[in-house]
Swiss-Prot record:
PANTHER family cross-referenced by the UniProt entry: DOLICHYL-DIPHOSPHOOLIGOSACCHARIDE--PROTEIN GLYCOSYLTRANSFERASE SUBUNIT DAD1
Cytoplasmic compartment residues: 1-35, 81-98
GO cellular component assignments: oligosaccharyltransferase complex
Membrane topology: Multi-pass membrane protein
A Pfam family it matches: DAD
Name under which the protein is recorded: Dolichyl-diphosphooligosaccharide--protein glycosyltransferase subunit DAD1
Pathways per UniProt: Protein modification; protein glycosylation
Subunit structure: Component of the oligosaccharyltransferase (OST) complex.
Organism: Malus domestica (Apple)
Record's keyword annotation contains Iron-sulfur: no
Family matches, as InterPro entries: DAD/Ost2
Span of the signal peptide: none
Protein family per UniProt: Belongs to the DAD/OST2 family.
Disulfide bonds: none
Amino acid sequence: MGKASHSSTAQDAVALFDSLRSAYSATPTTLKIIDLYIGFAVSTALIQVVYMAIVGSFPFNSFLSGVLSCIGTAVLAVCLRIQVNKENKEFKDLAPERAFADFVLCNLVLHMVIMNFLG
């Protein structure tokens, strides 16, 4: 009984990943690029946290600035992805150029705050 349950669970997991892969293959290239950017920003934040755990956090302002910059940029990129997605009905009247301009402006404000926090 346990082995049959395990194999059906494994088959369900494989079916789930196959369906996710096929659904994601239909995603437009622009959204995939934004997804890569989000993944890069989050992985950079994780690398900084691991580095801080191993080496230490002597200039704590620098550590906080780096992590908050990465996470803030990732959050802004998620907002950009939501606004640019054609299937999202909430932002159908918003031009992609306007969404990108908002993203750039918010990133400038975020990084000015981060630079101010550094001192």
